[in-house]
């Protein structure tokens, strides 16, 4: 992978700030998009047993965790050119939940669409690409950890 630029890191961080302005709403959008593409994914998340509820603190917390890990990936890519998982159990958790390769694509699409909505007219290809690279590298690190789980 090529170098992750300072500008890419800045784009990810600034759009993360936009997301944080309305976490419950954006979290609900994120999981709604996931379930539209992969309805069976509802069974992978205990907090979705009653559907997508923006007032559910577990839904909000998990969405924030996914997005924050992607932001952290951008920071790591800029600083050292690779992503190292802060939580070594992520691989085994994903294996236990039955996560397969196509699920990562569904999550990526939902993440990008959620951020597109969060930033509105500030969205552009450069911003989308920065998030895409950060997420792809995070997903690769999780998949690697899944292989050794």
Swiss-Prot record:
The modification Nitrated tyrosine is found at residues 31, 135. InterPro entries: Globin, Globin-like_sf, Globin/Proto, Leghaemoglobin-like, Leghaemoglobin_Fe_BS. Its main location: cytoplasm. O2 binds at residue 62. Heme b binds at residues 46, 65, 94, 97. One of its GO terms (molecular function) is metal ion binding. Nitrated in effective nodules and particularly in hypoxic conditions; this mechanism may play a protective role in the symbiosis by buffering toxic peroxynitrite NO(2)(-). Nitration level decrease during nodule senescence. It is found in: Cytoplasm, Cytosol; Nucleus. The modification Phosphoserine is found at residue 46. Root nodules. One of its GO terms (cellular component) is nucleus. Keywords: Cytoplasm, Heme, Iron, Metal-binding, Nitration, Nitrogen fixation, Nodulation, Nucleus, Oxygen transport, Phosphoprotein, Transport. Residues 3-147 form the Globin domain. GO terms for biological process: nodulation. Leghemoglobin that reversibly binds oxygen O(2) through a pentacoordinated heme iron. In root nodules, facilitates the diffusion of oxygen to the bacteroids while preventing the bacterial nitrogenase from being inactivated by buffering dioxygen, nitric oxide and carbon monoxide, and promoting the formation of reactive oxygen species (ROS, e.g. H(2)O(2)). This role is essential for symbiotic nitrogen fixation (SNF). Monomer. Belongs to the plant globin family. This is Leghemoglobin. It comes from Canavalia lineata.
């Amino acid at each position: 992978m090529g170098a992750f630029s300072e500008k890419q890191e800045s784009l990810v961080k600034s759009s993360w700030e936009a997301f944080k302005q309305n976490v419950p709403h954006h979290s609900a959008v994120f999981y709604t998009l996931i379930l539209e593409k992969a309805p069976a994914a509802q069974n992978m998340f205990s907090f979705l047993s009653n559907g997508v509820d923006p007032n559910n603190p577990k839904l909000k917390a998990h969405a924030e965790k996914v997005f924050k890990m992607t932001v952290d990936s951008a920071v790591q890519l800029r600083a050292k050119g690779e992503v190292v998982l802060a939580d070594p159990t992520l691989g085994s958790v994903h294996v236990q939940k039955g996560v397969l390769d196509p699920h990562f694509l569904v999550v990526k699409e939902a993440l990008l669409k959620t951020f597109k909505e969060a930033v509105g007219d500030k969205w552009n290809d450069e911003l989308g690409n920065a998030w895409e690279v950060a997420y792809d590298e995070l997903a690769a690190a999780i998949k690697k950890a899944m292989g050794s789980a």
